[in-house]
A protein has these predicted regions:
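Acidic, low-complexity, intrinsically disordered peripheral segments
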Residues: 2-4, 29-57, 148, 296, ...
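C-terminal motif of bacterial Sec signal peptides marking the signal peptidase cleavage site
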Residues: 25-27
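Periplasmic alpha-helical coiled-coil/stalk elements that build and connect Gram-negative outer-membrane
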Residues: 29, 206-324, 440, 444, ...
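Bacterial Sec-pathway N-terminal export signals of envelope proteins
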Residues: 29-135, 139, 303-340, 398-399, ...
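Short amphipathic coiled-coil heptad-repeat segments
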Residues: 58, 65-69, 73, 78-83, ...
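Small/polar, glycine/serine/threonine/aspartate-rich low-complexity segments that form flexible
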Residues: 84-95, 141-175, 305-315, 347, ...
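Amphipathic alpha-helical coiled-coil scaffold segments and their short linker/junction regions
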Residues: 102-107, 163, 259, 264, ...
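Sec/SRP-type N-terminal targeting helices
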Residues: 114-115, 131, 166, 180-208, ...
């Protein structure tokens, strides 16, 4: 019995290797090994990832500038460009930095200001991108290549039954599209971008105000930490005097060994508190340098806070302060700008329901040649190089898109309602912040007064108890208690004083008055470019 051998078509023979290659390649595309192997172990790369800090960030360059301060308290301009990647430092680094200089350095160095600035610049660029839709759009394109074609023919026309043609051509083309009318859609999109820019600019101001508050808070925290270090040194000196008195009285048989041991314990505790205070001061200094945008290891001296009167509180003007905050807070102004932007987005989505009218024009050319074989005689090659042009008035009006445009309107309206709710939420939050800041300032000022009385009383009690013990009419317990109370009183006075100035700055921030320049227009419509 014979079986007829099956024949595999050339197309099948060509397809089988391609299918096999596709299956093999798809099996090679398993990328699960790129994820961590186990859920209960931290991931570590098996080989170098090629990731490293850029040189400008790993070892930033420093730009020296002037550290002088004019009579108005503003630092003079430093020799650096706004887009310079290096850090700005004072020219004379041996001089201690004052609070205005620290604020100026923070505004120049802290990355938060650059992030907010770039966001504002991106929003401004977005206005230009939206305006581009109203300008003529020119597009040039070109295509060229070679093509071989085959066409079957009857035998009486071609002895081989087909003819072939080889062609090579290039097609340059210039297209023009110019929007004539879209019933306000593009204009609404431009206005939306403008309001978004305004919101980003107010956000930039809010970042600066928050940064100023952070510098002030860190500065006064560092000053309080320094005062606690000084109080700790004083406590060590007092405990050393008590130990000397206890040892002297013990040598003369007037004190027990328990008094000496108690004095030694108190001195050790005072030294422990001093070490802890030094560590806290180092941490406060590092935090201040960080918020200033400088490395924590940079050896810069911080100027002590000059003696000045405590800030004042005006409890009867809380409504005035709230109104001032509602008119000046940049974050609230940003919310208003975002609300206006969402209004324009609603208008743009509704305008999308209307037709779009545009002018379109084309200018192109065909440059190429064609040669045909198989007609029984050699045909000469034909070439062409001719221009083509056209002008059109184009009207596009989508009739049905499955509810896409209606849902776009619903989405824009929902975002508008969200922006309005956010504005209301932030308004209530600002009122609470003003009230809380006012109460916190009043409390801090009251604590300063109490701490001053406490400090004077503790100083008097410590002097008396120390002298009494030294003359044999007091006890070690009373002297130790008085010395510890003096340290606590001095620390409380330092902390409460720093808190008073910090709370005053927080109140200025809550009312939007913390920056040096505060020029907010009455209506946002006047500020739209």
């Amino acid at each position: 019995m014979y079986f007829k051998k099956s024949r595999i078509s050339p197309m099948t023979r060509l397809s089988l290797p391609l299918i096999a290659a596709g299956l093999i390649l798809s099996g090679c595309n398993d990328t699960r090994d790129l994820a961590p192997e186990r859920a209960d172990r931290a991931w570590h790369p098996h080989k170098s990832t090629g990731l490293s800090l850029p040189a400008s960030i790993r070892s930033p360059s420093f730009t020296a500038g002037s550290d002088g301060v004019n009579a108005g308290g503003n630092t003079s301009a430093l020799m650096t460009r706004p887009d310079h990647p290096g850090m700005v430092l004072p020219e004379n680094q041996d001089r201690a930095l004052s609070l205005p200089q620290l604020i100026d350095l923070a505004e120049r160095n802290n990355p938060r200001t650059r992030v907010a600035w770039e966001a504002a610049r991106q929003a401004a660029i977005g206005v230009g991108m939206s305006r581009a839709a109203m300008l003529p759009q020119l597009t040039f394109s070109a295509m060229g290549g070679f093509q071989r074609m085959a066409l079957p023919l009857p035998n009486y026309l071609s002895s081989r039954g087909y003819l072939t043609s080889n062609g090579a051509a290039a097609f340059p083309k210039l297209e023009l599209d110019y929007l004539l009318l879209d019933f306000g859609r593009t204009r609404a999109q431009i206005n939306e971008a403008k309001y978004q820019t305004l919101a980003a600019n107010f956000g930039f101001s809010a970042v600066h105000q928050q940064l100023i508050l952070d510098v002030i808070s860190a500065y006064h925290a560092q000053q309080a930490a320094q005062a606690i270090v000084a109080a700790s040194h004083h406590a060590v000196e007092n405990m050393a005097i008590l130990l000397q008195s206890a040892q002297s009285r013990h040598d003369h048989g007037e004190a027990t060994i328990i008094d000496v041991a108690t004095a030694q314990r108190n001195l050790a505790q005072a030294r422990f508190d001093l070490d802890k205070a030094n560590d806290a001061e180092h941490g406060a200094r590092h935090a201040l340098l960080e918020v200033t945008g400088l490395p924590a290891t940079l050896p810069l001296a911080i100027d002590a806070m000059p003696a000045r009167a405590l800030p004042r509180s005006t409890p009867g003007q809380i409504r005035q302060l709230v109104d001032q905050a509602l008119a000046s807070r940049p974050d609230l102004m940003a919310d208003i700008a975002k609300l206006r932007a969402s209004d324009e987005a609603v208008l743009a989505s509704k305008a999308a329901l209307r037709p779009r009218v545009a002018f379109a024009g084309t200018a192109s050319g065909y440059l190429g040649g064609l040669k045909t074989y198989g007609t029984g005689r050699n045909a000469p090659a034909s070439t062409i190089a001719q221009p083509e042009a056209g002008a059109f008035l184009q009207v596009s009006w989508p009739i049905y898109q499955g509810g896409l445009r209606a849902n776009a309107i619903h989405m824009a309206e929902s975002r508008r309602d969200e922006a309005e709710a956010t504005l209301l939420k932030d308004r209530l939050s600002i009122e609470r912040q003003v009230a809380d800041s006012q109460d916190a300032l009043e409390t801090a000022l009251a604590q300063v007064k109490s701490a001053e009385v406490l400090n004077r009383a503790a100083q008097t009690a410590n002097d008396g108890a120390t002298q009494a013990y030294a003359h044999g009419v007091g006890t070690m317990t009373d002297a130790s208690t008085a010395a510890a109370a003096l340290f606590e009183a001095q620390a409380a006075l330092a902390v409460s004083t720093a808190q008073a100035f910090t709370k005053a700055a927080a109140l200025a921030h809550a009312t939007g008055q913390l920056d040096l320049v505060n020029n907010v227009p009455d209506t946002l419509s006047d500020s739209v470019p």
